[in-house]
Curated annotation (Swiss-Prot):
Originating species: Metallosphaera sedula (strain ATCC 51363 / DSM 5348 / JCM 9185 / NBRC 15509 / TH2)
Gene name tied to this protein: hisE
GO (cellular component) term, any one: cytoplasm
Membrane-spanning residues: none
Pathway assigned to this chain's UniProt record: Amino-acid biosynthesis; L-histidine biosynthesis; L-histidine from 5-phospho-alpha-D-ribose 1-diphosphate: step 2/9
Protein name: Phosphoribosyl-ATP pyrophosphatase
Length: 93
């Protein structure tokens, strides 16, 4: 899964740099960090709702949405996956 996350993070970073027309990532960035942060919250709630009443496939789908929007927010903050990985390792000690 890490390879997929790193690949997706790279694509997100590129879209944020280039801001191509028609890019969903670019459209999120244009709406600002506050909007993206709210999307992360919305997607987190959707994961919770799915886990309580909508079944496994829906949980997987909503989790993918959550991870994508979280990666966009992290990129907008200039936070790398390596930084998050390091923090998780620190917490495992």
């Amino acid at each position: 899964m890490t390879d997929v996350l790193e690949e997706l993070s790279g694509i997100i970073a590129q879209r944020l740099r280039e801001m191509p027309e028609g890019s969903y990532t670019a459209s999120l960035a244009k709406k600002g960090k506050g909007y993206v942060a709210r999307k992360v919250g919305e997607e987190a709630v959707e994961v919770v709702v799915a886990s309580l009443s909508e079944g496994r496939e829906r949980v997987v789908s909503e989790t993918a949405d959550l991870i994508y929007h979280l990666l966009v927010l992290l990129a907008m903050e200039g936070i790398s996956l390596d930084e998050v990985r390091d923090e998780l390792r620190r917490r495992m000690k």
